């Protein structure tokens, strides 16, 4: 007798459920997406014990006809595609026909549905077996309840996380669906307590305000671009509003939330040097394209996609963000603490996106050089950098008006840190409607960020504090400038242009530099030897797993040759390519940091004025190459409020 046998449908569904239904969040995602595909305009999600005990989804969509109810729970049964041509033109969120049978096979499921023009259908399924089917009175739409999830797969149940974590995973999914479909009203409840309510009026900014808070919504920059193949719309935060995780960036493709590392990287590249190292923006990007250009049939969870014109899309995203930021003055405001507590606390802060971190491809970042230790080497000697100042013989004394106790100046728009879960509110429909109307009104009152150019306004110096911070003023208020960061930006743009113009000339090393590698690393570097020659780095094999370098490009900064060579090797080993543009930029950053004035260095008024004027000539006078802010602003109104001149 043969050993190979065909598995029965129930066992096949259990196996399929392992990929489709990983946790309660997977069930919520699949069922809510089905509701959206059914043209629902209102969806309610009710949870008990983070969905492990009960998940109930109620919608007002098209419903399911009686004759389709049983078929819907068979494997690969779907109304969304008919043939292989449809598979490459998918516009719906679901299409595989795996979700419902997979969910039903590992839970106790109850379905009440009606198309509105016939009696409804009541269906009960337990562990994949149909227990009951009957006609029932029902409004148009679908009401589906999933209870005792994983009751028949105890091994899966054992690996569920805490209630807090599983609820965080669900809210993460619901938030992203809400952003993807602002035209759908979503209500999320946990143990009969409301967590989220969106109006469904199509305003993405209002959804973002519901999730992240009205304060974050006020710091959103609208993004819009179009090419022959792609249309991009969305919002990203100003560089002053960041998080410690990239999971606060959401990418939507044809209405589907996807996890795509290269899209997130493109958003980061759009900020370029505006972000501090290790900080990420809050962003929402909706991308529309011909379904033929994207493959969504990569994984049963449908979170991963592949693009056929990926490089064109990435370039469009980067250029769109860079263009938007060039139109804005990126000076963060230094706020004043007031007695009034902000009403709108971010729902997102309750259940942080960290609970649902996406698994990213193992493509490590090449870390940009951090700010160098101020006690390291002396500044490099260059012919035409920004002026390098020496402390004046007569130490400049700050005006008496500035000699006072050091105050704690904190920008009001500093990165919003993650906060613990706050108490959930019991659901009250009247209170809910009032809160939603109040939020709508606040979003309508948000002033659009002025797109009137990013030129730094004229600044008039009035003093210096601790030999580190410059005070300046104009008709808009008081400015505080970090003198090291300011000159670092000036020098960076000088060195960046200088390094970028250098021809492919090489310089001999006095002592050859030896590079020892593992066998895998050696093979990868050997594969890229010709590419390395094109950028002026010549390697000679030395032994079985080593190379020696006898010469290097002339643009390598003096004293940093071996460090740049190591960076190039790291690129080749990890990225399997040589990015000369990135290497030159890193060299410019290192050179600019070393050549800049340091803290605790007093300047004359003339030197301060010259520094500010030179800063105004840079293309980005707002952040240093490492993304730290160069200056912060106190408006005249804020100062008057501090001193109780206005109330």
Swiss-Prot record:
Listed GO MF terms: ATP binding; ATP hydrolysis activity; ATP-dependent DNA damage sensor activity; mismatched DNA binding
Stored InterPro entries: DNA_mismatch_repair_CS, DNA_mismatch_repair_MutL, DNA_mismatch_S5_2-like, HATPase_C_sf, MutL/Mlh/PMS, MutL/Mlh/Pms-like, MutL_C, MutL_C_dimsub
Origin superkingdom: Bacteria
Short name of one Pfam family: DNA_mis_repair
Any GO BP: mismatch repair
Coiled coil stretches, renumbered: none
One GO CC annotation: mismatch repair complex
Entry keywords, A to Z: DNA damage, DNA repair
Family (UniProt): Belongs to the DNA mismatch repair MutL/HexB family.
NCBIfam families per record: mutl, PRK00095.1-3
Function comment: This protein is involved in the repair of mismatches in DNA. It is required for dam-dependent methyl-directed DNA mismatch repair. May act as a 'molecular matchmaker', a protein that promotes the formation of a stable complex between two or more DNA-binding proteins in an ATP-dependent manner without itself being part of a final effector complex.
Protein name: DNA mismatch repair protein MutL
Annotated organism of origin: Bacillus thuringiensis subsp. konkukian (strain 97-27)
Lineage: Bacteria, Bacillati, Bacillota, Bacilli, Bacillales
């Amino acid at each position: 007798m043969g050993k190979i046998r065909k598995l029965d449908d129930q066992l096949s569904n259990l196996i399929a459920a392992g990929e489709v239904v990983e946790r309660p969040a997977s069930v919520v995602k699949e069922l809510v997406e089905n509701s959206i595909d059914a043209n629902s305009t209102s969806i309610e999600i009710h949870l008990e014990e983070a969905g492990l005990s009960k998940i109930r989804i109620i919608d007002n969509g098209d419903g399911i006809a009686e004759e389709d109810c049983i078929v819907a729970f068979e494997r690969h049964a779907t109304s969304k595609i008919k043939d292989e041509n449809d598979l490459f033109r998918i516009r719906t969120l679901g299409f595989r026909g795996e979700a419902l049978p997979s969910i039903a096979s590992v839970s106790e499921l109850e379905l009440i549905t009606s198309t509105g023009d016939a009696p409804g259908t009541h269906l009960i399924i337990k562990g994949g077996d149909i227990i009951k089917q009957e006609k029932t009175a029902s409004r148009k739409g679908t009401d589906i309840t999933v209870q005792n999830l994983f009751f028949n797969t105890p091994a899966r149940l054992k690996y569920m996380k805490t209630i807090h974590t599983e609820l965080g995973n669900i809210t993460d999914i619901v938030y992203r669906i809400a952003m993807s479909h602002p035209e759908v009203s979503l209500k999320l409840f946990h143990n009969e307590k409301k967590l989220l309510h969106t109006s469904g009026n199509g305003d993405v900014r209002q959804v973002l305000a519901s999730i992240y808070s009205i304060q974050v919504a006020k710091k959103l920059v609208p993004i819009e671009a179009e090419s022959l193949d792609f249309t991009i719309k969305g919002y990203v935060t100003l560089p002053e509003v960041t998080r410690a995780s990239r999971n606060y960036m959401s990418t939507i493709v044809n209405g589907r939330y996807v996890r795509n590392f290269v899209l997130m990287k493109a958003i980061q590249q759009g900020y370029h040097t505006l972000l501090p190292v290790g900080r990420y923006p809050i962003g929402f990007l909706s991308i529309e394209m011909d379904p033929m250009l994207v493959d969504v049939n990569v994984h049963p969870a449908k979170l991963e996609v592949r693009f056929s014109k990926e490089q064109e899309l990435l370039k469009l995203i980067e250029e769109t963000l860079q263009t938007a930021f060039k139109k804005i003055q990126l000076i963060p405001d230094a706020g004043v603490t007031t007695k009034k507590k902000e009403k709108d606390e971010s729902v997102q802060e309750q259940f942080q996106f960290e609970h649902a971190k996406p698994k990213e491809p193992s493509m490590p970042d090449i870390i940009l050089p951090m700010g160098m230790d101020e006690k390291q080497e002396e500044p490099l000697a260059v012919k035409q950098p920004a002026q390098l100042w020496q402390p004046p013989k007569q130490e400049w004394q700050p005006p008496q008006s500035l000699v006072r106790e050091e105050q704690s100046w904190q920008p009001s728009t500093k990165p919003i840190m993650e906060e613990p879960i706050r108490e959930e509110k019991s659901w009250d429909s009247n209170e809910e409607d009032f809160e939603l109307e109040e939020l709508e009104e606040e979003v309508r009152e948000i002033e659009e960020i002025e797109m009137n150019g990013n030129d730094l306004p004229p600044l008039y110096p009035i003093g210096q504090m601790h030999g580190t911070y410059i005070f300046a003023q104009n008709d808009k208020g008081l400015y505080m400038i970090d003198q090291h960061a300011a000159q670092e930006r000036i020098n960076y743009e000088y060195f960046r242009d200088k390094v970028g113009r250098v021809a492919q000339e090489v310089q001999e090393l006095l002592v050859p530099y030896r590079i020892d590698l593992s066998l895998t690393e050696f093979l990868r570097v050997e594969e890229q030897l010709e590419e390395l020659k094109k950028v002026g780095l010549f390697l000679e094999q030395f032994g079985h797993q080593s190379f020696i370098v006898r010469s290097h490009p002339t643009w390598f900064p003096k004293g940093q040759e071996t460090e740049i060579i190591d960076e190039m090797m790291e690129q080749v080993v990890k990225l399997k390519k040589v990015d000369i543009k990135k290497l030159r930029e890193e060299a410019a950053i290192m050179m600019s940091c070393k050549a800049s004035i340091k803290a605790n260095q007093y300047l004359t008024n003339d030197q301060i004025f010259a520094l500010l004027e030179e800063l105004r000539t840079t293309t980005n006078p707002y952040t240093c190459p490492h993304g730290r802010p160069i200056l912060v602003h106190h408006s005249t109104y804020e100062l008057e409020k501090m001193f109780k001149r206005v109330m």
